[in-house]
Amino acid sequence: MGIASEALKNFKGFNLKSMPEVEPVSPGHRACQGCGEVLALRQAMKAIGTNTVVCSATGCMEIITSPYPQTAWRVPWIHVAFENAAAVVSGVEAAYKAMNRKKIIDQPGVTFIAYGGDGATADIGMQALSGALERGHNFVYFCFDNEAYMNTGIQRSSSTPFGASTTTSPAGSKSSGQATWKKNMAEIAVAHGTPYVATATPAYPIDLMNKVKKASLVPGPAYIHIYSPCPTGWRCGIDESIEVARLAVQSKVFPLYEVIDGEFHLSRKVAKPKPVSEYFKPQRRFRHLTEAEVQFIQDRVDVEYEKLVKKCVVEDKKKEKE
């Protein structure tokens, strides 16, 4: 039995009746209307609780929660550079470990969190994250993936999906938007031998919170890739964030799964998938795509999903009902 399996063998998850009341991230922040990322952040931090130290990369969640002299954070929180959240949390975790060992402090149960957007994770901060995972620091990393550099003007990242129009991959007469496929950061984390890796979305809050709680219980690094709708950048309605996130799962564009000690477990089997065209429809960043391009994307989604299913040693018995 691996270290994650051992840590989680008696795991008891959240449900609607046992939802924690604690709010480490307070209301009154400055997120855009309909922001899916801050909702995901709130859900994740409710699952973690208050005995934590958080290291935040520069990005949307840093900007909207910490305009000096105000803060939305009710826990120790450190703002660091775009690229080094994982490096900083490594140092914080090591410092706490040393101070506990030397009896300078008596705080053995602190959960160490680092987070960033897709740009800070998959691009600018990937080297620091890779190093932290390889060294085996005891921390949880959240990637809040809104599929572009939204904070600085909706520029494409390596997590921007194929065909999406951004300010640096604009659709036009000679371009169909983003020309490369989305980088699979969850599987990159798995390739590092990370004990616990998962995907989540705020459209399924209990699933997200249970995965975050599991990650916090595993000794060693854990990585959670959280799909985070951005109405501003995706050009969908401010009331459509959760519906778009749900459609991403139902269309197999963003599968929900977890990897425990290298074993893949599908969290939600999509028995009757919806076409990717239905997922694209609310988002004007995809409105330029032709039927042929949509079918091209559909074929790729189908292939990637089947690859994932074949990796899974256990599939959740629950079928997609929607």
Locate each region found by the language model:
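Cofactor-binding active-site loop characterized by glycine-rich and histidine/acidic residues
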Residues: 3-141, 154-164, 178
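Short, conserved beta-strand edge motifs with alternating hydrophobic and charged residues
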Residues: 143, 198-200, 223-227
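Flexible, low-complexity linker and terminal segments
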Residues: 1, 230-322
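Electropositive phosphate-/nucleotide-binding environments in soluble metabolic enzymes
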Residues: 22, 34-38, 82-86, 179, ...
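Short, surface-exposed, charged loop/turn segments at secondary-structure junctions
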Residues: 155-162, 205, 212-219, 236-247
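Conserved thiamine diphosphate
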Residues: 15-19, 28, 107-108, 158-214
